[in-house]
From Swiss-Prot:
GO MF term (any one): ATP binding
Glutamine amidotransferase type-1 domain mapped to chain residues: 3-184
Signal peptide residue numbers: none
EC number assigned by the record: 6.3.5.2
Active site (catalytic residues): 75, 162, 164
Organism: Methanoculleus marisnigri (strain ATCC 35101 / DSM 1498 / JR1)
Name this protein carries in UniProt: GMP synthase [glutamine-hydrolyzing] subunit A
Highest taxon of source: Archaea
Assembly information from the UniProt record: Heterodimer composed of a glutamine amidotransferase subunit (A) and a GMP-binding subunit (B).
Functional pathway: Purine metabolism; GMP biosynthesis; GMP from XMP (L-Gln route): step 1/1
NCBIfam families assigned to the protein according to its UniProt record, in alphabetical order: guaA_Nterm (TIGR00888), PRK00758.1 (NF001975)
Lineage: Archaea, Methanobacteriati, Methanobacteriota, Stenosarchaea group, Methanomicrobia
Originating gene: guaAA
Database matches in InterPro entries: Class_I_gatase-like (IPR029062), GATASE (IPR017926), GMP_synth_GATase (IPR004739), GMP_synthase_A (IPR023686)
Length: 184
């Protein structure tokens, strides 16, 4: 079975994403966000766009959304997804660093098994302000209106929080669900 690719967007938790997947016995490989899309398309069964400081340092990661593979965008990965598909991001009113209670508005294969409210770990200053056409807002919080969104037809999923951090309650379930999506 092909691995999942974790795209390194220069974020502080990207190696923790890789470590979490490997600890779960999910084959995964870290790649640069400058890896040519054709190479990515041949080598994996799904993509995790990791976090990072700015869209300007996201390399060619937005091109990976057009490969027909399932994609999970985490933090900056969510912002890459939103802007590449016609949405918008802005500086958050308060930003988020620490524990946040997220409310799930709509269930989805990525969020299968989670309760309607859950504790997650946030580490961001920007947020999605306009959800792209074809996407559904799945979750929000008191500090961030779009905590999760998805384009079910394209198998594109984005979350603002960090499931790889131990402070996110049951964060591994999200990776388990994404692995299942990539195995369908």
């Amino acid at each position: 079975m092909l691995p999942l690719y974790v795209v390194n967007n220069h974020g502080q938790f990207n190696h923790l994403i890789l470590r979490t997947l490997r600890d779960m016995d999910i084959e995964a490989t870290m790649i640069s966000n400058e890896t040519p899309p054709a190479e990515v398309a041949r080598g994996c069964r799904g993509i995790v766009l990791g976090g990072g400081p700015t869209l300007e340092r996201a390399g060619v990661a937005s091109a990976y959304l057009d490969l027909g593979l399932p994609v999970l965008g985490i933090c900056l990965g969510l912002h890459i997804m939103a802007t590449a598909r016609g949405g918008a991001i802005r500086r958050g009113a308060s930003g988020g660093f620490g524990a946040v209670e997220v409310e799930i508005f709509e269930q989805n294969p990525l969020l299968r098994g989670y309760p309607d409210r859950m504790q997650v770990w946030a580490s961001h200053a920007d947020e999605v302000s306009v959800v792209p056409e074809g996407f559904v807002r799945l979750a929000g919080s008191s500090i961030c209106g779009v905590e999760a969104m998805a384009s079910p037809d394209e198998h594109l999923y984005g979350i603002q929080w960090h499931p790889e951090v131990s402070h996110t309650v049951n964060g591994r379930l999200l990776f388990e669900n994404f692995d299942g999506i990539c195995s369908e």
